[in-house]
């Protein structure tokens, strides 16, 4: 099996081979090393991230294991409570999602009945979901004629003498609970179909849930420590045996991983006496150090580990930064060299435990020298980038692309006096992220050539992006930027699917789309009904001039690292959906997807295999490379 995986890894440069590799990753975790000996754990959920960071065909596959757990995710964002909007029809009134729909109904009825309105104003009413308690209140106020009666009871002739009673249709709706509809006209009423929606757009648009990006960038410097975790191979999979820090201590324990981690955490706690947050800086730590520690994280140790964050029971935080994500693909030694520190080799990971134990003294010495070099390089880089990309600071970001683009967006938007805003609450964040689709859409399986947009930056820099806080609208306004909750119906004829949905058997579904994606979908023959939207009245002017100014500064630095950054930005931006500028990303991705679709319109659909927002797979038999295709590069 190991030989098979090693062969697949060396040839994992095409879609078919990568898919075969994924199948094995459902059963095994690959233990690999790069050319500098840094360990890398590859599993089903992180292979795309690994491939975006490095060429996996040159990695050395050391072994396979089933003993190593996956990287533990952050606590999931609470699911947005399902939502039903208010419907005020001539035959009935259905309140919006509420813990107390009966109270909403009596308040609605008070708009027509002055005596109810007067009683509410004079005495008020306690929240309740009990019909008997509502009726008791009505009776005590001399309003028994308006008593609430369930529709089924009324039809049994039990309450026909109460001509002014409030007839309610009672129901239980999945994931919502009890709901009531006030029946205004018995003769014309039929129970309506009510859309149960994943988001309450009116709530999401509230001003207090949005903040200016610039307000989040003014952060003071936090204590920084370089760190590296080293792992050895045993019969039961890899284990951490050494944790090195600089400036700081090195912890070594071959007998108890639990004690190794506890000693490290005790030291962390001791150095946090004067601060509530510190930064640990590693290199490729997201691919080895953190997931390896996560496997053995002790229960009841006073700390929880979630992705790159450690949180103590008293609220202290340790943020574990991966400097590799700010290196533009440089090796550790090249990164240190280009930021002015002496490059030192580091101990190899995934060596035998017996070898590590025998050479522990030299490994400690080698580790400390390597970490000192990393620490000095990081401090120099962070100082340079914080000048270049002011007011952004490295520790506020997980990737250099986010830092660069945030600085440009902030500079351009602040110069216009408008500013870009971001959601400060989980629910609006989830709404924005739901509109970001990075998945491939499969059209048909055939041998294909892969094409990629030549310059994502060229496409996105000439477009407009939202400025200011959003407003709620029922339907978006043509010509304005908005993100809408949509009911989507796919075309009945043969079509290229341009709106991603994970159920091929469903012809109508609800999803979140930008105004740009809505235009693209309508062009492709989809029917779109908007169910509420966040709309922006102002736009940030095109970013091209701001990008050019920043790019000129990068050129002026004339360093390999910054030139690599420039190349990476121009040729291959990899967006993500968990960034302070996710609002920018969602529209940038939509603009790229619209560009891809404009190229697909010039190609016979039978030749299209699959596509994403920046890549297109076209049948190998397709020969008519037109002018539109010249804007893409064949890989």
Swiss-Prot record:
Pfam families according to UniProt: Pox_F12L
InterPro entries: Poxvirus_F12L, RNaseH-like_sf
Highest taxon listed in the record's lineage: Viruses
GO annotation terms (biological process): microtubule-dependent intracellular transport of viral material towards cell periphery
Description of how the protein assembles with itself and partners: Interacts with protein OPG164. Interacts with protein OPG064.
Known function: Plays a role in intracellular enveloped virus (IEV) transport to the cell surface through microtubule transport. Together with protein OPG064, forms a complex that interacts with host KLC2 (kinesin light chain isoform 2) to engage the kinesin-1 complex and thereby promote IEV trafficking.
Family: Belongs to the orthopoxvirus OPG056 family.
Name of the protein described by the UniProt record: Protein OPG056
Species of origin: Vaccinia virus (strain Ankara) (VACV)
Taxonomic lineage: Viruses, Varidnaviria, Bamfordvirae, Nucleocytoviricota, Pokkesviricetes
Gene: OPG056
């Amino acid at each position: 099996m190991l030989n098979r995986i090693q062969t697949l890894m060396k040839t994992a440069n095409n879609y078919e081979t990568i898919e075969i590799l994924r199948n094995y990753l459902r059963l095994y975790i690959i233990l690999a090393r790069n050319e500098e000996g840094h360990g890398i754990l590859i599993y089903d959920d992180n292979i795309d991230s690994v491939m975006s960071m490095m060429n996996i065909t040159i990695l050395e596959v050391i072994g396979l294991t089933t003993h190593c757990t996956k990287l533990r995710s952050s606590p999931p964002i609470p699911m947005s409570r399902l939502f039903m909007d208010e419907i005020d029809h001539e035959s009935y009134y259905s309140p919006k999602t509420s813990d107390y729909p009966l109270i909403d109904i009596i308040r609605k009825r008070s708009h027509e009945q002055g005596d109810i309105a007067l009683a509410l104003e004079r005495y008020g009413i306690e929240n309740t979901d009990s019909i008997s308690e509502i009726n008791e209140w009505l009776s005590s106020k001399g309003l028994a004629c308006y008593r609430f009666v369930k529709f089924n009871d009324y039809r049994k002739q039990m309450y026909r003498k109460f001509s002014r009673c409030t007839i309610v249709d009672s129901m239980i709706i999945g994931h919502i609970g009890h709901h009531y509809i006030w029946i205004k006209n018995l003769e014309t009423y039929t129970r309506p179909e009510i859309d149960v929606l994943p988001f309450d757009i009116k709530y999401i648009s509230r001003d207090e849930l949005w903040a200016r990006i610039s307000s989040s960038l003014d952060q003071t410097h936090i204590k920084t420590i370089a760190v590296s975790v080293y792992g050895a191979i045993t019969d039961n999979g890899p284990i951490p045996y050494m944790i090195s820090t600089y400036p700081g201590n090195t912890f070594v324990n071959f007998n108890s991983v639990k004690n190794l981690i506890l000693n490290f955490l005790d030291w962390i706690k001791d150095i946090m006496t004067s601060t509530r947050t510190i930064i640990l800086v590693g290199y490729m730590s997201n691919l080895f150090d953190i997931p390896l520690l996560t496997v053995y994280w002790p229960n009841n140790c006073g700390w929880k580990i979630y992705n790159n964050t450690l949180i103590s029971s008293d609220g202290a935080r340790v943020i574990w930064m991966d400097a590799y994500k700010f290196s533009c693909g440089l090796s550790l030694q090249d990164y240190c060299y280009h930021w002015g520190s002496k490059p030192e080799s580091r101990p190899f990971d995934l060596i035998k435990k017996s070898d590590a134990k025998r050479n522990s003294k030299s490994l400690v010495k080698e580790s400390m020298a390597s970490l000192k070099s990393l620490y000095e390089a990081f401090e120099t880089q962070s100082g340079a980038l914080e000048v270049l990309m002011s007011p952004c600071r490295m520790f506020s970001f997980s990737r250099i692309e986010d830092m660069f683009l945030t600085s440009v967006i902030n500079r351009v938007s602040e110069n216009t006096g408008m500013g870009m805003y971001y959601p400060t609450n989980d629910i609006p964040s989830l709404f924005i992220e739901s509109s970001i689709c990075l998945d491939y859409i499969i059209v048909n399986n055939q041998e294909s050539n892969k094409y990629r947009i030549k310059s994502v930056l060229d496409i996105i820099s000439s477009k407009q992006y939202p400025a200011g806080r959003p407003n709620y609208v029922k339907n978006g306004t043509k010509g304005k930027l908005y993100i809408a909750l949509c009911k989507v119906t796919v075309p009945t004829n043969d079509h290229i699917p341009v709106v991603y949905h994970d159920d091929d058997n469903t012809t109508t579904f609800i999803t979140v789309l930008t105004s740009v994606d809505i235009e693209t979908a309508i062009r492709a023959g989809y029917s779109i009904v908007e169910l509420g939207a966040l709309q922006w009245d102002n736009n940030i002017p095109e970013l091209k001039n701001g990008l050019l100014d920043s790019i000129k500064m990068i050129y002026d630095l004339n360093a390999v690292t910054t030139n690599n950054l420039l190349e990476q930005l121009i040729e291959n931006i990899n967006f993500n959906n968990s960034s302070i500028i996710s609002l920018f990303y969602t529209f940038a991705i939509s603009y790229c997807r619209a560009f891809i679709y404009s190229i697909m319109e010039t190609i016979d659909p039978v030749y299209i295999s699959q596509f994403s927002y920046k890549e297109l797979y076209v049948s190998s038999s397709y020969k008519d490379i037109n002018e539109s295709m010249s804007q893409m590069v064949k890989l």
